[in-house]
Amino acid sequence: MEQRKLKLRDLTLRDGQQSLFATRLSQAEIDKLLPYYENAGFYIMEVWGGAIPDSVMRYLDQSPWDRLRIVSKAMKGKSLLSALSRGRNLFGYVPYPDSVLEGFYKEAIANGLNVMRIFDALNDIDNVRESIRMINKLGGIADGAVCYTVDPKPEAPAEKKGFFARLFGSKPAEPEKIFTDEYFVEKAREMERLGAKIITLKDMAGLVTPSRAASIISKLKANLSVPVDFHTHCTPGYGLASSVMAILNGVDILDTNIWWFGGGSAAPAIELIYVFCQKLGIELDVNMQAVGEIRDHLLDARKSLAAFDLNKDKMPRNFDPLADKLPADVDACLLYTSPSPRDRT
């Protein structure tokens, strides 16, 4: 049986630095990393969009268009380059007319962009419809992102007065759930029908639990014919576990960062995903030696961002999964808690 391969989208140069370091990574620091990225073999690299254009112009006095062109030239087509778009709001904060959308997407693709991840924070399909259509028309890859969220907790009822009122009072009915698995599947199917070539479950707040990641990803895989991507953050502490559950349930692409830009309020580190995939018999479709070279240089890049690094005094120790050994108790725990191949079918 052929070993399963998991494709990766590297977020380090966009979402990683935005989540941890206020999007202040300079072009000079990025230029030092690009020769190593060329050989890493990431399926997709997210390098643009989100807060990048605003921050690059506002705080670094640099051109976001230059950044896209420089990265595209350096990568030589070896990884697809992606950006994050707020649908009708593009990279801004107000809705734009169709003429602006089309002109912007045309220039983005002409300057080296391949994949546009398109989302609306309220999952309003009308706000992503034209973006998906235009990206496809212009020769790009439309990545439809379904935003994950949870139902609000019902307010506690007012305390009833008196012993018998509290004893015999009826319990208020639970409100009907809105954000069910079926809700996310239907939003994904709508985007697929519009022409999205990738569907992402986008958990930008890190709210999706491991069990919920498993149930939603398995249903997306059963109901879609396009690749499924999983995006989460480690803010509450279980982003890594949720990512592993997404892997176990057949996700095609996983979003990760490289060590010094991973974890915390960012996406999980690829190095830890690699450890779990080794235990599970799943191959990462990436050159981990090249990833190690990027990691070595990323530490200097992180040090250059000390003014924006809330954890500069308590950074994790370096970890090279190709050379370092996990502590025996941790390694045994991973071995005995990893599902068997039979469990993964």
Language-model region placement:
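Hydrophobic faces of well-ordered beta-strands that scaffold small-molecule active sites
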Residues: 8-11, 45-47, 79-85, 116, ...
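Conserved, mostly hydrophobic/aromatic
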Residues: 16, 118, 199, 250
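Active-site beta->alpha loop and helix N-cap motifs at the rims of alpha/beta catalytic domains
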Residues: 49-129, 146-184
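Alpha-helix-loop-beta-strand connector modules within alpha/beta enzyme cores
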Residues: 58-82, 133-144, 214-230, 280
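Active-site-adjacent beta->alpha loops and helix N-cap segments on the catalytic face
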Residues: 61-65, 121-138, 181, 206-220, ...
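Catalytic cores of alpha/beta
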Residues: 238-249
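Glycine-rich phosphate-binding active-site loops on the catalytic face of alpha/beta enzymes
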Residues: 252-266
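Conserved small/polar residues in nucleotide/adenosyl-binding loops
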Residues: 336-345
